[in-house]
C-alpha cells in the first residue's frame, strides 16, 4: 500500500533518462511573453507581485544589502511557485516534492551566506552566536545551540517545502483511491472534498514559496 501511495512521486524513466525532471524547466516557455510589445493582464499582475516582493525583500535586507541582491530571491520565489503550481496538474511531475531539488536550492545559498559572512564579517558572525543579554554562565550553552540551529537551516528549508508538497498530494491520492469503491452519492461528496483540498493546496504552494524566499532573505541579512 505504501509503495503504491508514494509511487506518484517516483520519477519515471524512458531509455534510462528521467525525462519528467524536464517539467522543472517548463517555465522557460512563458518567458517570451514578457517581451511582447503590449503586455497582457497576466504580465502586469505578475510584475506588480514582483515589485511588491522587491520592496519587501529590500526592507528585510536593510541598507547594507547589495544592489540587485533581491533579484536572487525573487527568482527563487518564482521558480518554486511555478513548480509547486505545475505539480497540482494531473500527470505533471512535482519536482519540489523531492529533496534533490529543494536541497539543491537551499544548501548552496546557505553555504554562500556562511562563507561570505565568516570571511568578510567574522566578528559579526561570532556576535550572532551569543544573543544579547545572555548570562555569562549560559554563553557556552547558547553558542552550541546557535551553532546547531545555524547548521540545520538548509535542511529545515528543504524539508519544510518537500513535506508540505508531499502531504497535500498524499491526501489527494488517498481520497482518489477510495473513489472506485464508493456509491455515486459518496463520490459527489468526495469530489467536493477534493476540490476544497485542491484550493487549500494552491494556497500552500504560494505560502511555501513565499516562506522559502523570505527565510533565505533573512538568512542573507544576518551576515551583512
From Swiss-Prot:
GO terms classed as biological process: determination of adult lifespan; locomotion; muscle cell cellular homeostasis; neuron cellular homeostasis
SUPFAM superfamilies attached to this UniProt entry: F1F0 ATP synthase subunit A (SSF81336)
Location, primary (coarse class): mitochondrion
Membrane topology: Multi-pass membrane protein
Pfam families per the UniProt record, alphabetical: ATP-synt_A
Gene Ontology CC terms: mitochondrial inner membrane; proton-transporting ATP synthase complex
GO MF: proton-transporting ATP synthase activity, rotational mechanism
Transmembrane segments: 17-37, 72-92, 99-119, 125-145, 155-175, 184-204
Record's subcellular location: Mitochondrion inner membrane
UniProt entry keywords in alphabetical sequence: ATP synthesis, CF(0), Hydrogen ion transport, Ion transport, Membrane, Mitochondrion, Mitochondrion inner membrane, Transmembrane, Transmembrane helix, Transport
UniProt cross-references to InterPro entries, sorted A to Z: ATP_synth_F0_asu (IPR000568), ATP_synth_F0_asu_AS (IPR023011), ATP_synth_F0_asu_bact/mt (IPR045083), F0_ATP_A_sf (IPR035908)
Assembly notes: F-type ATPases have 2 components, CF(1) - the catalytic core - and CF(0) - the membrane proton channel. CF(1) has five subunits: alpha(3), beta(3), gamma(1), delta(1), epsilon(1). CF(0) has three main subunits: a, b and c.
Function comment: Mitochondrial membrane ATP synthase (F(1)F(0) ATP synthase or Complex V) produces ATP from ADP in the presence of a proton gradient across the membrane which is generated by electron transport complexes of the respiratory chain. F-type ATPases consist of two structural domains, F(1) - containing the extramembraneous catalytic core and F(0) - containing the membrane proton channel, linked together by a central stalk and a peripheral stalk. During catalysis, ATP synthesis in the catalytic domain of F(1) is coupled via a rotary mechanism of the central stalk subunits to proton translocation.
Family designation: Belongs to the ATPase A chain family.
Protein name: ATP synthase subunit a
Lineage per the UniProt record: Eukaryota, Metazoa, Ecdysozoa, Arthropoda, Hexapoda
Amino acid at each position: 500500500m505504501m509503495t503504491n501511495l508514494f509511487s506518484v512521486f517516483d520519477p519515471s524513466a524512458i531509455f534510462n533518462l528521467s525525462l519528467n525532471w524536464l517539467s522543472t524547466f517548463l517555465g522557460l516557455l512563458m518567458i517570451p511573453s514578457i517581451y511582447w510589445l503590449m503586455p497582457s493582464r497576466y504580465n502586469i499582475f505578475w510584475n506588480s507581485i514582483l515589485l511588491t516582493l522587491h520592496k519587501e525583500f529590500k526592507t528585510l535586507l536593510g541598507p547594507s544589502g547589495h544592489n540587485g541582491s533581491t533579484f536572487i530571491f525573487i527568482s527563487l520565489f518564482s521558480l518554486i511557485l511555478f513548480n509547486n503550481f505545475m505539480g497540482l496538474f494531473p500527470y505533471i511531475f512535482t519536482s519540489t516534492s523531492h529533496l534533490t531539488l529543494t536541497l539543491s536550492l537551499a544548501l548552496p545559498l546557505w553555504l554562500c551566506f556562511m562563507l561570505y559572512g565568516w570571511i568578510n564579517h567574522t566578528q559579526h558572525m561570532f556576535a550572532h552566536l551569543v544573543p544579547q543579554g545572555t548570562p555569562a554562565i549560559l554563553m557556552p550553552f547558547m553558542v552550541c545551540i546557535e551553532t546547531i540551529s545555524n547548521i540545520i537551516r538548509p535542511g529545515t528549508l528543504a524539508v519544510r517545502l518537500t513535506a508540505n508538497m508531499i502531504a497535500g498530494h498524499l491526501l489527494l491520492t488517498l481520497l482518489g483511491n477510495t473513489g472506485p469503491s464508493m456509491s455515486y452519492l459518496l463520490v459527489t461528496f468526495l469530489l467536493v472534498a477534493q476540490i476544497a483540498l485542491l484550493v487549500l493546496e494552491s494556497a500552500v504552494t504560494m505560502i511555501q514559496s513565499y516562506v522559502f524566499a523570505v527565510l533565505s532573505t533573512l538568512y542573507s541579512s544576518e551576515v551583512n
